[in-house]
Amino acid sequence: MKALVYVGEKKLDFREVPNPVVNSGEQLIKVDSAGICGSDMHAYLGHDERRPAPLILGHEASGIILGGDRNGERVAINPLVTCMRCQACISGRENICSTRQIISMAPREG
């Protein structure tokens, strides 16, 4: 697939990257629209060490699910990747999951 990759301060490269691996409980989404957030700009300007180059930025997106029971469904992407097993997740407070990851921050690409 093609992606715009952050490769260093104020540097982006439009390139071919490997297709994403879809893990259990995840969906493959063909992104139709993506927003540029303030945190993406911080990374682009070199002000966020949590987003080291090279990295596919972007965590505000929408698109269409490809495959599975929900094939073709239009969705907005929740950028949080959580365990869904801890007390916070079980009680509906995934935003404070102690193992949460955010799409577009290592180790998760955007």
What are these regions (language model features)?
Residues 7-10, 81:
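A generic beta-sheet turn/junction motif
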Residues 13-15, 50-52, 99, 104-107:
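A short, acidic/glycine-rich surface segment
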Residues 1-2:
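Extreme N-terminal starter segment of soluble prokaryotic enzymes
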Residues 13, 84-85, 96:
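Generic structural signal for helix capping and beta-alpha/helix-loop junctions
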